[in-house]
């Protein structure tokens, strides 16, 4: 499903064909690559009534003592499962990934790749593409385009997600590579 003129697609939350739970994607980055990546943008813990929750680690840690990429990617994908409004309980994950886009582009791309694999609906794939993936490419175009092209070759689902990316200020050469990797016709 490709976004068209920013109109909501007809099948907003249709389960993807070949259903069943998505396979658990393996994180490709070593554990040390996640050191210092936590954005600290979790909702303030002090609004919780429960003192134990208020003192808990950031949400992206899950049940571990460090950022858990699988937990973050799964929560990020599930945040878009409810359609255009998403899921408020999981909105923190989208904010976390968006913060990563600016300071940790390689980590952000890995979370996006994993979230696409966890996605269960066309709508989730669309929102990830026209959201954080588009922002990431717009900000770090030449730094990550090679990895993006590789992921598009490896995964039809990632390629479909990439088809939802708009130009967002990318230079001509990078934009042509995005178009080609997503199966669209380059401009030249």
Regions found by a protein language model. Name each.
Residues 2-21:
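Short Lys/Arg-rich cationic patches that frequently serve as NLS/NoLS or arginine-rich RNA/DNA-binding motifs
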Residues 59-178:
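Alpha-helical solenoid scaffolds in large eukaryotic transport, assembly, and signaling factors
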Residues 13, 21-23, 39, 43, ...:
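Polar low-complexity intrinsically disordered regions enriched in Ser/Thr and small residues
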Residues 20-46, 53, 57:
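Cysteine-cluster motifs in flexible loop/terminal segments that predominantly coordinate metals
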Residues 55, 176-188:
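Acidic, small-residue rich beta-repeat scaffolds with periodic aromatic anchors
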Residues 40, 53-54, 82, 172, ...:
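A generic structural signal for solvent-exposed, polar alpha-helical segments
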């Amino acid at each position: 499903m490709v976004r068209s003129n920013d109109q909501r697609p007809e099948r907003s939350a249709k389960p993807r064909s070949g259903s069943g739970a998505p396979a658990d994607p393996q994180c490709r980055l070593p554990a040390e690559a996640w050191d210092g990546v936590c954005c600290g943008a979790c909702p303030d813990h002090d609004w919780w009534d429960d003192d134990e929750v208020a003192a808990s680690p950031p949400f992206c840690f899950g049940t571990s003592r460090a950022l858990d990429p699988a937990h973050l990617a799964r929560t990020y994908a599930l945040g878009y499962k409810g359609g255009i409004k998403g899921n408020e309980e999981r909105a923190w994950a989208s904010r976390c990934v968006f913060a990563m886009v600016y300071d940790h582009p390689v980590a952000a791309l890995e979370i996006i790749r994993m979230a696409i694999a966890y996605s269960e609906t066309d709508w989730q794939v669309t929102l990830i593409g026209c959201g954080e993936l588009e922002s990431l490419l717009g900000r770090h175009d030449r730094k990550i385009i090679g990895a993006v092209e590789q992921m598009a070759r490896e995964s039809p689902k990632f390629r479909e997600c990439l088809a939802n990316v708009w130009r967002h200020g990318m230079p001509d050469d990078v934009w042509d590579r995005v178009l080609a990797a997503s199966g669209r016709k380059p401009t030249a």
